[in-house]
Structures are given as structure tokens and as C-alpha cells.
């Protein structure tokens, strides 16, 4: 069931609390809803490093760790703690009565994020991060090398 604002009914809050996790789909995205330390969080159920399902991972101290390559993600923001992995997409969660509703979160400027990831990948020599950033920029209609990237220390 989808609400007027695009939120998707993921399941019951009692099931989420009992099982610790729910899986749903919001638009084209598979979504993992996690009950952790008394609160519900939702992130894309695909590790951005290699695409494996995050629902097989572990949660500890507000972090979700991918079961396969151990990439770590902050449950609240989806931000990675590992430079070689990308951030995962976070979703907003609302619990009303005994229903868990999940909706897409405004993600900000995707092109700016991808340009930042390209710069970080180049700085750290991470070819996977570079490739994913370039492909993302092309998909977003941006030219990856169309403008000069400002580098720390004044080099460009």
C-alpha cells in the first residue's frame, strides 16, 4: 500500500520489533528497515560496494556492517565509514499506530555528491570509486571532466 505522499507500508511495528528487520520496496529500491536501540531506520538493501543484500549484515552501535566485504554504514544517514565504499541510500521511517511507513528521503544534490566521490577516489587511488562516480555523473547527465575540480592545497 502506498500513501498520498509516496510512503510505502512496510509492515507492522510489532513484527519489526520482534524480528528486528523488515524488507520492502520503495519505487525501484529494495529497502531494509531495521529496529535498533529502540528506533526504526531504513536504508537501501543493497551494499553500494558490490551490490550484496545488506539484510544479511549485522547492526551494532548504530552501524550496519555488510556481511560480505564488511563495509560499514551509519543507520541514520546511510554514510559509509569506509572510503572504498559509497554511501547507501537512507529512507525516512514513520510508525503510525502499528504500521511502519517508509518514504524516500530528499537526497540533496546528487551531482555534487558524485563529484566529491570522484575527487576522493582520485585522491586515494580507488579505481572502483572512480568508476562508479564517473558512471553516476554520466547517468545524471553531467560531464565528469567538464570542469576543473578544486584540489586541497591549491593544485588543480
Task: Explain the meaning of each model-derived region.
Residues 64-65, 76, 95-98, 122-125, ...:
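Short C-terminal domain-edge/linker segments immediately following a structured domain
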Residues 73-79:
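M16/MPP (pitrilysin/insulinase) zinc-metallopeptidase core fold and M16-derived inactive scaffolds
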Residues 102-156:
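Mature, well-folded catalytic/scaffold domains that follow N-terminal targeting or propeptide regions
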Residues 47, 66-69:
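Short cysteine clusters
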Residues 1-61, 75, 89-113:
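N-terminal pre-ligand scaffold of iron-sulfur
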Residues 5-11, 70, 84, 137-141:
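Short, exposed beta-strand "edge-strand" segments with a Pro/Gly-rich flavor and a Y/T-containing core
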Residues 61-67, 80-89:
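Short cysteine/histidine-rich metal-coordination sites, predominantly Zn2+-binding motifs
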Residues 29, 35, 68, 84, ...:
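A residue-identity detector for tryptophan
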Amino acid at each position: 500500500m502506498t500513501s498520498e505522499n509516496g510512503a510505502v507500508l512496510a509492515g507492522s511495528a510489532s513484527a519489526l520489533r520482534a524480528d528486528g528487520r523488515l524488507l520492502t520496496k520503495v519505487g525501484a529500491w529494495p529497502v531494509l528497515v531495521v529496529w535498533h536501540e529502540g528506533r526504526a531506520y531504513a536504508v537501501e538493501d543493497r551494499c553500494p560496494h558490490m551490490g550484496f543484500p545488506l539484510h544479511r549484515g549485522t547492526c551494532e552501535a548504530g552501524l550496519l556492517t555488510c556481511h560480505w566485504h564488511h563495509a560499514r554504514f551509519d543507520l541514520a544517514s546511510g554514510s559509509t565509514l569506509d572510503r572504498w565504499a559509497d554511501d547507501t541510500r537512507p529512507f525516512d521511517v514513520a510508525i503510525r499506530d502499528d504500521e511502519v511507513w517508509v518514504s524516500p528521503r530528499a537526497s540533496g544534490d546528487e551531482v555534487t555528491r558524485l563529484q566529491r566521490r570522484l575527487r576522493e577516489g582520485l585522491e586515494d587511488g580507488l579505481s572502483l570509486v572512480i568508476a562508479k562516480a564517473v558512471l553516476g555523473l554520466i547517468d545524471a547527465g553531467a560531464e565528469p571532466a567538464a570542469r576543473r575540480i578544486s584540489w586541497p592545497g591549491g593544485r588543480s
